[in-house]
Amino acid sequence: MSSLSRELVFLILQFLDEEKFKETVHKLEQESAFYFNMKHFEDLVQGGEWDEVEKYLSGFTKVEDNRYSMKIFFEIRKQKYLEALDRHDRAKAVEILVKDLKVFASFNEELFKEITQLLTLENFRQNEQLSKYGDTKSARNIMLMELKKLIEANPLFRDKLNFPPFKVSRLRTLINQSLNWQHQLCKNPRPNPDIKTLFTDHSCAAPTNGARAPPPANGPLVGPIPKSAAFPPMGAHAPFQPVVSPSPNAIAGWMTNANPSLPHAAVAQGPPGLVQPPNTAAFLKHPRTPTSAPAIDYQSADSEHLMKRMRVGQPDEVSFSGASHPANIYTQDDLPKQVVRNLNQGSNVMSLDFHPVQQTILLVGTNVGDIGIWEVGSRERIAHKTFKVWDISSCTLPLQAALMKDAAISVNRCLWSPDGSILGVAFSKHIVQTYAFVLNGELRQQAEIDAHIGGVNDIAFSHPNKTLSIITCGDDKLIKVWDAQTGQKQYTFEGHEAPVYSVCPHYKESIQFIFSTAIDGKIKAWLYDCLGSRVDYDAPGHWCTTMAYSADGTRLFSCGTSKDGDSHLVEWNETEGAIKRTYNGFRKRSLGVVQFDTTRNRFLAAGDEFVVKFWDMDNTNILTTTDCDGGLPASPRLRFNREGSLLAVTANENGIKILANTDGQRLLRMLESRAYEGSRGPPQQINTKPPIVNTLGSVSNVSSPMAVNSERPDRALPTVSMSGLAPMDVSRTPDVKPRITDESEKVKTWKLADIGDSGHLRALRMPDTSATSSKVVRLLYTNNGVALLALGSNAVHKLWKWQRTDRNPNGKSTASFTPQMWQPANGILMANDTSDGNPEEATACIALSKNDSYVMSASGGKVSLFNMMTFKVMTTFMAPPPAATFLAFHPQDNNIIAIGMEDSTIQIYNVRVDEVKSKLKGHSKKITGLAFSQSMNMLVSSGADAQLCAWSIDGWEKKKSRYIQSPANRSGALVGDTRVQFHNDQTHILVVHESQLAIYDAKLECLRSWSPREALPAPISSAIYSCDGLLIYAGFCDGAIGVFEAESLRLRCRIAPSAYIPPSMSSGGSVYPMVVAAHPLEPNQIAVGMSDGAVHVVEPLDSDPKWGVAPPQDNGTHPTISAAPAAANKPEV
């Protein structure tokens, strides 16, 4: 629907409300979905009219639309259910349970079971979580507070919660103006015309006696005006524009070349004053009406119904954008200037953005293409992704050529979508990627867009067609709009004559538009109509400029730097396209492009001269500065969180400084104290079920900016809102007597999770139609997580793929659905060269390309490169002797491979030129492990000599070597295969030997180790980090699997072989996992390759989705290892 049609609906709503057609008003609100009347919604809820509540809501959202909507409907139906129980109306309660609440069972079966169990209680308040449930009225009011917060946070209600302000009886006024205009065109205008209908145009009848009509009387232009409508005002917005000029007020003044079409030809024939620009304040406040004819008010028509509804009222003044700005009560003390956190990303940070809902979650992008997500409250990096092309086959040839020429890539911009469910990343070469974000730190690949030729310089999210879109701009001088979820292109805007540097989408009066700036300093504006730019203005400095609105969308600012280093921070008068205010304080020539941000509709901040500078928006002089305790670059990047309580600033040496004001410090202290209290809670709480309130997701965290994700209990705050079944006022805190538990008591009462039968997990044996079986010596997931690749001791590969089905629509790997064993139609096998040797005695090795298209593998013979789709051998190289024993791709160049050899050397091989660039010597036995750290710029190797070596990537010289330490219960020098894998933080190393698991730092110092004992006494056969870096999975030679805490190496769960090996396949302990593979996206799923050739996928049950619980901490301290979900260095094990 066009914006004018939408505004017409608002006029009709106002008219219906003034005429007291209340039911019709709310019906139109629901059917049009333009305005959600919160007052009407509150009345329905407080009156318990649940059917009407859901009926009204249905016009705006459905249960399955998003997690906010799901939570809204859940709370309503839950309250209806509890009220039925409170009335002891069991039949009605059962009906609600089956018809209304059953839908939520598919999202959380445990929740549904617990709600069902309330039927068995005489009084549901006997349930501990509902013990504070009061009477019906108070419960409804408490729930209503929660619902209002959910509705305000729900993106589907964007721009629908406020009614636009305009004069009362606006529709009558427009009709009166139209009648006056029609009367002016009468050939024989009468002094007191009689308007009897609106169905046809007015025309005075000719005089019957041939006399001319008397001259017109000077009467009022409009009739009596009723009282103001009951709709709440939305804020400073312009009124409905006269039909003569439909251009939006917010952008009209910039549109020097705009030619709006006139919908009625008769209007163009009128006096010039009728078609003047709509941004003229006098015209807005005093619309001109022809005065050559007497005024007509259609209320004078012969309509008894209308006359009955007439009432004298008071005129009100029109408010319009940019007229004035309300006074702000904030002071300089509200600025975040105190350094409270120092984080290190590991590489230079190029972009920052705080989560729009979770105030302490920070997204960062770096100069090596990495993105990371930090929980600044706990100082933990909860997610990490290194750059990779997800599907190289779908990329354009220019992109493939660019990556082949230079694999280095940087993040130019990363940011969150408005509701924080999606994040977007723009790279310095062609690509934009979007991820779906889950608050437990999980990132799921969503869309990969080959967006521009050259770099993608900026991105932004918008809702041009009620669906989330992502706007991109690039070096190819284009601006494009894409569907954020599918990556489908929607619009292309061209007109810039230089690379486009930044984009700034916005909306005013339901008109959506985009500002863009190019590196030649040109500012342009675009509507979503592909009719070209509406603006062509010059930015101060004529070079790199970014634009941003204040949080309330009423003030527009830009900040830029010229080629000479002169920086400019200005406020624009957006209705006139002129600079309104220029801020002082840039005294020296900037050494980089100055970045800026706004907060609280009051303050501006920019990074310049090695400090952060602050301004009051209404004062051109600098307000204050902070050097953040030193260590800032010349032009630091910075970003406020939504509330303005925290400020993230980039620092030297890959650092990020977090600054806070009083509110921010209080927020972080609360997070710390609650995390501490949670760690000291009563031991009996460890095995209790989580509160029902958040089991549908993390929606409830919109209740407070201090809420954290409930899906990560190790970082969650104690719930202060109602647990599950009855929401409480978040301002109330439970009256709980603290209990101090002795640490030794915790250790004594904690119990290891020991899974001994298949009923406590999900396990699936991969189907295998091959006639022969051999040991699985290598196993790995593809990078997208939808396939498993195994290499047997007979040199033959096997590939399993999960297919998309009705039951598994996403085609994700899971133990719930059997995958297909993949093989080309011609039946070809993917078999390694064996060079007439015995592959059973050879050391096999395998490595997968980042795009999952090719696999490199060897089994004692030549190294073969296979096409994963056709199984064809693309090439072979490195004929033995010596044979290759380990393969690892260089993190920055896929054409360079580190190859561990049987003769103890490491060869750095360039595939493109078929040449060994370097040969590294330092081991005395064959190489059994290689791992790269891009951030540390090093390669770590391990060998059958139980030695670790660190090598510099730059010159390939050896930096250090060390033999792994022998456990206390083992004498003599260690020998045997040793594996290495870098943690996601790129600084800690997991070292795996049959005698131990050990964590080393980058200096090859052993930080801690664990040796087989007690519950897991057998030698270790394999081990690997989980994809989020929080767990370590280890296989043992007796068939058991151990799940360890990655940071402390404490055992949290033991999985007996009887739990995942079918009884028919068991062979008395002789079968064991030779290799363990971790899923790249699901941290609690693993695959194990067995000594009998079988492959099993193992994961916990949905009802208990984690492997046991974390063991209690002792009084010792350990170096912290950050958690990050991206498996940046997935080892070949």
UniProtKB/Swiss-Prot annotation:
> Which effects follow disruption of this gene?
Semi-dwarf, with reduced male fertility and shorter panicles with arrested branches and abnormal spikelets.
Question: Is Oxidoreductase found in the keyword set?
Answer: no
InterPro entries this protein is in?
Answer: CTLH_C (IPR006595), LisH (IPR006594), Topless_fam (IPR027728), Topless_Znf (IPR048419), TPL_SMU1_LisH-like (IPR054532), TPR1-like_2nd (IPR054080), WD40/YVTN_repeat-like_dom_sf (IPR015943), WD40_repeat_CS (IPR019775)
Which PROSITE patterns does its entry note? CTLH (PS50897), LISH (PS50896), WD_REPEATS_1 (PS00678), WD_REPEATS_2 (PS50082), WD_REPEATS_REGION (PS50294)
What Gene Ontology cellular-component terms does the record carry? nucleus
Keywords, sorted A to Z: Nucleus, Repeat, Transcription, Transcription regulation, WD repeat
Ranges: WD repeats: 344-384, 451-492, 495-536, 539-582, 586-625, 630-669, 771-810, 838-876, 879-919, 922-961, 970-1011, 1015-1054
Q: Which SMART domains match?
A: CTLH, LisH, WD40
- Could you tell me which residue ranges the CTLH domain spans? 34-92
Any single Pfam family the record assigns to this protein:
zf_topless
Residue ranges for the region (Disordered) are: 1102-1133
Q: Where in the cell is it found?
A: Nucleus
Give all residue intervals belonging to the LisH domain.
4-36
This molecule's function is given as: Transcriptional corepressor involved in branch formation regulation, presumably by suppressing primary branch formation and promoting secondary branch formation. Required for the cell elongation in the first internode and pollen development. Probable downstream regulator of strigolactones signaling important in axillary meristem maintenance. Acts in auxin signaling and is associated with the regulation of histone deacetylation. Essential for the function of miR172 microRNA and its target genes in regulating panicle development.
- Know anything about its domains from the record? The N-terminal TOPLESS domain (TPD) (1-210) binds directly to a 12-amino acid LxLxL EAR motif peptide.
Subunit structure, as described in the record:
Tetramer. Interacts with D53, probably via the EAR motifs. Binds to AP2-1/TOE1, AP2-3/SNB and AP2-2/IDS1. Interacts with WOX1. Interacts with MOF1.
Q: What is this protein called?
A: Protein TOPLESS-RELATED PROTEIN 2
Gene symbol of the encoding locus = TPR2
